[in-house]
């Protein structure tokens, strides 16, 4: 079965569902400015898979939030995301929880 990435908004939360990887993240990348407008939390609870491209996108989304004047936190961070962040020596501020 082919999976994909989808997202929706609930107030100030961006809910991500599916696979956050290089094969599926282009649509979110293209809509990142609109998707992040007013977002203070990114919920990863619905993510089934993530790769390094997905982690890079998360770092970018957090930075985009900062540029828009909002501190963004991540909710539902999987062990996979934490492991990839540690392997790349990302500071806690890059993927704040």
Predicted regions and their residues:
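STAS-like cytosolic regulatory interaction modules
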Residues: 1-53, 59-97
